[in-house]
């Protein structure tokens, strides 16, 4: 067991599950960066969500956040534990640079026998991910979810079936939508971006009483490179990763934020009409590394 600077992550990992020790191996070191260029017509308030999430899922070795021109910025944490930044952008060109070196798992845990957790046994903080939300109208998907999962074991197998159904039924078209669409709208259209496919899967999971949440972050070797969205489902007393845009579930994921849907995990909210995003550049590079084992 690591000591010193790793002790907080060790403590959290031990207490994460209700049924024994949970071991997290962080064996991939990535450098991630996001550069945003805005043109500000009139001073505009922004709430940003660009720092990587701090938790046992990943270990942040280095974190850089630069804004030009330099102005005051307020840091806070939202109700889901995501890091938020609040500022008022001045008139003119406004640049934001964020980068981090992060240790993450090279592989995603796959546990086909992970069991369904009955609602009365769910942790309180998980309950909110059972309910319909703005972009995940789970109350509209019950019949379809039961049709998709009718021959599946309760739990992981149901979520895996839902993930496969979304990947095969909703066409993944990167860059096809600029604004968030609801799960009902995406199901009707039959195509969408990563966020859209994840939200359809979330709505389906919640409709059969499996908590599910949206994740936004970086994915190594994503083509075309951009920020990415996937989802997690709560089964077997922990969160498991799923991604309907990928035929093979893989690791190399750096998490920025979790939430109920796109409303909670937008990388920036602008207030007023005087803020234009002219360019966004995202990079994910693999670095030399030594694995970290967290017990």
Which residues are covered by each model-predicted region?
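Short, surface-exposed linear segments at secondary-structure transitions and domain or protein termini
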Residues: 71-73, 119-122, 249-258
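N-terminal polybasic/positive-inside topogenic patches
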Residues: 15-18
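Intrinsically disordered, low-complexity N-terminal segments that are enriched in acidic
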Residues: 22-108
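Short intrinsically disordered coil segments
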Residues: 51-53, 112-120, 245-249, 271-273
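Secondary-structure boundary elements
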Residues: 40, 96, 102-106, 112, ...
């Amino acid at each position: 067991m690591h000591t010193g600077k790793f002790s907080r992550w060790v403590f959290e990992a031990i207490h994460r599950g209700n049924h024994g020790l949970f071991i997290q191996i962080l064996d991939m070191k990535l450098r991630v960066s996001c550069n945003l260029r805005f043109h500000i017509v009139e001073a505009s308030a922004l709430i940003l969500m660009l720092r990587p999430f701090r938790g046992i899922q990943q270990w942040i070795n280095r974190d850089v956040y630069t804004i030009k021109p330099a102005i005051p910025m307020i840091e806070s944490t939202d109700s889901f534990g995501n890091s938020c930044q609040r500022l008022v952008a001045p008139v003119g060109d406004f640049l934001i640079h964020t980068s981090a070196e992060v240790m993450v798992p090279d592989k995603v845990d796959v546990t086909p026998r992970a069991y369904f957790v009955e609602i009365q046994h769910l942790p309180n903080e998980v309950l909110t991910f059972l309910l319909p939300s703005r972009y995940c109208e789970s109350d509209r998907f019950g019949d379809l979810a039961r049709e998709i999962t009718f021959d599946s074991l309760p739990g992981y197998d149901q979520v895996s079936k839902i993930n496969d159904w979304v990947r095969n039924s909703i066409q993944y078209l990167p860059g096809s939508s600029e604004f968030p669409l609801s799960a009902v709208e995406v199901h009707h259209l039959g195509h969408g971006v990563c966020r859209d496919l994840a939200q359809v899967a979330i709505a389906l999971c919640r409709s059969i009483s499996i908590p599910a949440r949206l994740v936004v972050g970086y994915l190594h070797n994503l083509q075309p490179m951009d920020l990415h969205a996937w989802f997690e489902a709560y089964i077997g007393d922990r969160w498991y990763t799923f991604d309907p845009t990928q035929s093979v579930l893989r690791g190399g994921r750096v998490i920025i934020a979790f939430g109920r849907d796109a409303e909670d995990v937008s990388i920036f909210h602008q207030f007023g009409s005087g803020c234009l995003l002219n360019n966004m550049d995202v990079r994910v590079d693999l670095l030399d590394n030594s694995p970290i084992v967290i017990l």
